[in-house]
């Protein structure tokens, strides 16, 4: 009878151990001989990629620090440099622009990173120097150049702390040419940082906030900024120098994700002869990418249930052992049983948590 009760208690512990805790994700250099797909927590990317929608014929201008021209995963249609007199020196020596280009359009070539829109056409405008410094004048030149190239989307993973009339005019000009401008809502530099970032804060720009790996808003400060859509920005795989990849976190990368995703929606709409506007595009992006931002993360519920069930199991085991102790002749077996059971509880929880961690990475 005692053994039967013990089995029932252990079954309860196993059930409790099947729930999860919040995993921890660390940034690192990634090297792989196989293709690496981008984060797709909501399954939104798969619905396009599985139907061979990869951004074909969609032109995306990237205004950043240039591009690594030797990276095997990256290709571009045109490129130009606005940071010096040599317009042909668009080589990225900073790394930021290469990462943005990789997230948006890394090619599907059987190895390395696959971008959000791997068949899109990239137009590179180097508007930030090798130290990452950027001025209004260079961004304005980049915007005007992108308009001349008749691109469909302009990605600006850069930000200014204030607006500029000439910058706004360049943005307005791009919008008037039916170009979708996607820009960062601004990094969170400290707790309580809710300052608006430009050009993302302009009304006609799609301003992007950041989601964590679970599809939740990364920081509450984003709720106080001008954000039109949230996109994944934690632990995104990026292209880097020497054909390496990195895991990176930041709203810059969320912006790139959003630009690539916009290209997928565009291709899908064009294939069905549907019209494209900023509002209709934004509506689809929000429906696809922001499914879970108002809900409670799954690990909150499962972690709570795990704690409650484990607590109840331990209390039940303790009561059972006390009652058995009083009835026992030797008064040793119940204590030994309780000790073994507690050890099993700890072991089961540790194993299940580790398995969930591996699955959740």
Positions of the model-derived regions?
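Final/C-terminal transmembrane alpha-helix of multipass membrane proteins
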Residues: 336-356
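C-terminal subdomain of the subtilisin-like protease fold in secreted/lumenal serine endopeptidases
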Residues: 152-156, 165-166, 177, 204-207, ...
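Active-site core segment of subtilase-fold serine proteases
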Residues: 28-121, 141, 214
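Catalytic-core environment of secreted peptidases
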Residues: 74, 210-252
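Substrate-binding/access-modulating region of protease and related hydrolase catalytic domains
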Residues: 127-202, 243-255, 298, 303
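Sec-dependent N-terminal signal peptides of Gram-positive bacterial secreted proteins and lipoproteins
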Residues: 4-24, 318-320, 348
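Sec-dependent signal peptide cleavage junction
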Residues: 19-29, 354-359
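Hydrolase catalytic cores
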Residues: 101-104, 125-128, 233-298
């Amino acid at each position: 009878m005692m053994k039967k009760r013990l089995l029932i208690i252990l079954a309860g512990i196993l059930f409790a151990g099947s729930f999860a805790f919040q995993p921890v994700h660390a940034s690192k250099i990634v090297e792989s001989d196989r293709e690496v797909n981008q984060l797709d927590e909501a399954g939104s990317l798969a619905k396009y990629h599985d139907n061979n929608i990869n951004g074909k014929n969609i032109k995306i201008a990237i205004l950043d620090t240039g591009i690594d021209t030797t990276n095997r995963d990256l290709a571009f249609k045109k490129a130009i440099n606005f940071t010096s007199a040599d317009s042909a020196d668009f080589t990225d020596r900073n790394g930021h622009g290469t990462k943005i280009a990789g997230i948006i359009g890394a090619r599907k070539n059987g190895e390395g990173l696959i971008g959000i829109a791997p068949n899109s056409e990239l137009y590179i405008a180097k508007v930030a120097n090798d130290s990452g410094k950027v001025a209004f004048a260079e961004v304005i030149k980049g915007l005007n150049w992108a308009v001349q190239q008749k691109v469909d989307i302009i990605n600006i993973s850069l930000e200014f702390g204030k607006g500029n009339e000439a910058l706004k005019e360049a943005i307005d000009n791009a919008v008037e040419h039916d170009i979708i401008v996607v820009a960062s809502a601004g990094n969170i530099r400290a707790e309580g940082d809710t300052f608006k970032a430009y050009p993302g804060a302009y009304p006609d720009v799609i301003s992007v906030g950041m989601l964590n790996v679970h599809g939740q808003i990364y920081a509450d400060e984003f709720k106080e900024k001008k954000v039109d859509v949230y996109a994944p920005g934690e632990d995104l795989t990026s292209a880097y120098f020497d054909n390496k990849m990195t895991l990176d976190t930041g709203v810059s990368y969320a912006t790139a994700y959003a630009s690539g995703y916009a290209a997928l929606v565009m291709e899908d709409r064009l294939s069905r002869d549907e019209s494209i506007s900023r509002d209709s595009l934004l509506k689809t992006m929000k429906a696809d990418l922001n499914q879970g931002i108002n809900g409670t993360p799954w690990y909150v519920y499962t972690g709570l249930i795990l704690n409650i069930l484990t607590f109840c199991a331990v209390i039940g085991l303790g009561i059972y052992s006390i009652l058995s102790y009083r009835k026992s002749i030797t008064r040793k077996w119940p204590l030994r049983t309780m000790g073994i059971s507690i050890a099993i509880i700890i072991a089961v929880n540790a194993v299940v948590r580790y398995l969930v961690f591996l699955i959740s990475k």
